[in-house]
Amino acid sequence: MAAKLIKGAEVAAQIREELKKEVDELKAKHHVTPGLVTILVGENPASVSYVTAKQKTSHELGFHSIQDNQAADITEAALLALIEKYNKDPKIHGILIQLPLPKHIDSNKVLYAIDPNKDVDAFHPVNVGRILIGTYAFLPCTPAGCQELINRAYGDPKGKEVVVLGRSNIVGKPMVAIMIQKRLGANATVTCVHTGTPKDKIIEHCRRADILIVAAGVPRYVQGDWVKEGACVIDVGVNRVGVSEKTGKAILVGDVDFD
């Protein structure tokens, strides 16, 4: 079977169109406008870019969307007080904290301060537990996006061999928990390989995968001969490997060597 490139932009556009209809219906039938606040601490260029993109999409979908920018030297206590304000705000249904936070702030303490019912990144321990037992309302965005790509571009993963390369709290672990659920769009046979897995075993597992999800954080780590013919490969990695002499822009590559 010839390799087929999944065009994520097309899938994203389709999802945005579906969400816009849902938001319009929510407003018309229930007179409710989804409210989202994104809290940005400092001026990290990558974080600013991410938050700007989130705000743009939120406004396009018709959300009541707030971008709350705070100085990098904000105290932990002040940030916790700000979160509590939005926890109590009935117009806000979702709270996003853009990571990373400055070193003087305990990220876990901040994330755990968010009302679990407004924790749309699903980082709160309550939501992590809900994901594990399959009663979740929210999923972390990257694993959820991977699941959408698989179902829309590859097909039902039920019974398929899924290999997740990486065990981060943001991608790897929740990805495993999502794909093993006995529900539509999951119900797969899942293996997780990571830094504790010998490389020869990593290669062995990858070659067996019907669906390979790579979130290793290592540029061009997975090689073409690690992937069996017809397998679906989702490359989560975004790695900066230098600067282009022609454009002066960063050169970004994934965790899979597609060349």
Features from the language model and the residues they span:
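Conserved hydrophobic helix-helix packing surfaces used for dimerization/oligomerization
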Residues: 34-36, 162
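Anion-binding alpha/beta catalytic cores of soluble intermediary-metabolism enzymes, centered on
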Residues: 96-162, 202-203
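Positively charged, low-complexity intrinsically disordered leader regions
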Residues: 1-31
